[in-house]
C-alpha cells in the first residue's frame, strides 16, 4: 500500500463540482463544492465552459485538502466521476477549448436525430451501441460541433483536436495534457462505442462523420491512466487511477455488485440502473444497455440496464430560479408538506423532453389539473410527485426487460434527502426504499475505483462492508390510490 493514506474523489456534476477526500475505511475526512455557470444561448441549448469546470475542480481540490487538514502529498490516488455525454473539443497541444461544451441536456440536434431515424438506422444503432438515437448522447453533439465550428473537422482529421466527455477533459488537465483517455462506462454513452468489442465502432463513426484521430483511448474503470503534473495543490506523480460516469459510479458506490441489484440516483436528472452481469441485456421497453464498469485493463466487464430521466432536481431548481416560489431548493419539502396532497395537480417534468422509456425530445413540461383552488404548495407537491412517477415508469420497464422484480429500491443523490419525495416514491413503487448514510455514492464509487486502480484495495468487498442504510421508507399508499395516481400520470404524459 502507498505511504499516503487518502483517496481524492473528483465528482464533476452538471451544476457544480464536488471533491471528497476519503480514508482507507471509506470515511469522508474533507469535502468541498463549487457551482459553475450554466449557459443557455438559445431555447433548448445548454452549454458549459470547460475552463470554468477545470477552475472549479482546482478550487475544490484546494478547499477539500484544507477542510481535511491535509497536504497534497497525503493523497495516494485520484478517482473521477462525471456528468456523462457532455461533449467538448480542445486543441491537443495547448488544451485550448474550441468552444463551450455541449451539455447532455442540450436538444439542438433533435432535427439531426429525426433525420437519422427516418433513414432507418436506429435498430442498427441499438444493436451496436445499446443506445437510441437521441440528442442526449455525445455522437450527434460531436457531429454538430464539426459542422458548425470553423476548421474543427480539418484540425481533428490531422490529429490536432481532442474530443472528450468530461472525464477525458479532467484526466487531460490533471496529467498536464499527457493522457487522452476515457473509460468504458463513459465511452458507452457516446453512440460511438461497440458494446461487444468495447472499442470505437468504425460503422458508427462513419455514420456520424467523426474523425478517428480525435477519439480518446478507451480504458478500464480502475487502472492508472497517468499521474498528476503541474497542479496548484497536488504534487506531481499522484496516480489518476479510476473513473466512471456518474451513474455507473453510484451503482458501484451502492455496492450493487450482483446481477439484479439496482439503484436510483436523484440529481439534476434521475437515473435508475440495474446490474445485469457480464452479458449485455438488450432492451425492448425503451431502456438503455450500457457498460457499468470494467475493473482493470483486461478484467471482466459488468453491464447494466439504465432508465434515464432528464429532469429531477432540475425541476426543483426551476421552481427556485424560474418561478421563484422558493428561496432554497430544500425549501420545497416544507412547502409541499403544507398541503395533504397535490389537489389533483399533475406535473410532467419534461423540461428537456422526455427520456426513457418514452424518448420524446419534442415533449415539454406540463402542469395538468390546475383550477382556482390550486396553490403554489399544490404545484410544489406535484413537482415532487412527478419526479417519483417518472421513476415508476422506468422501474416497470426494467422489470419487463430484466425479468426481475426490484425487491428493495436503493436511492441516493442530493434529492434523496427529501423525505416526502422518498416516501411517495416507495408508495408508487409499492416496495421498500432504502436511503444510505452517505448520499454522495457517486463520490464513494469514484474514490473506490481510484483506490482499486492504485492498489490501495484489492477487491470491491470493502465497499460492501462500508455501505450502511440510514432510513427505510415502507410503502403506505393503498393499491387503489396508487392506481389513481398512475392513471392521472399516464394521461398527463400523453398530453406533454
Swiss-Prot record:
Binding positions for sn-glycerol 3-phosphate per the UniProt entry: 14, 84-85, 136, 246
Annotated GO CC locations: cytosol
Pfam families for this protein: FGGY_C, FGGY_N
Binding site for glycerol: 84-85, 136, 246-247
PROSITE patterns: FGGY_KINASES_1, FGGY_KINASES_2
Enzyme class: transferase
NCBIfam families reported in the protein's UniProt record: glycerol_kin, PRK00047.1
Family affiliation: Belongs to the FGGY kinase family.
Protein name: Glycerol kinase
Natural source organism: Myxococcus xanthus (strain DK1622)
Upper classification of the organism: Bacteria, Pseudomonadati, Myxococcota, Myxococcia, Myxococcales
Name of the coding gene: glpK
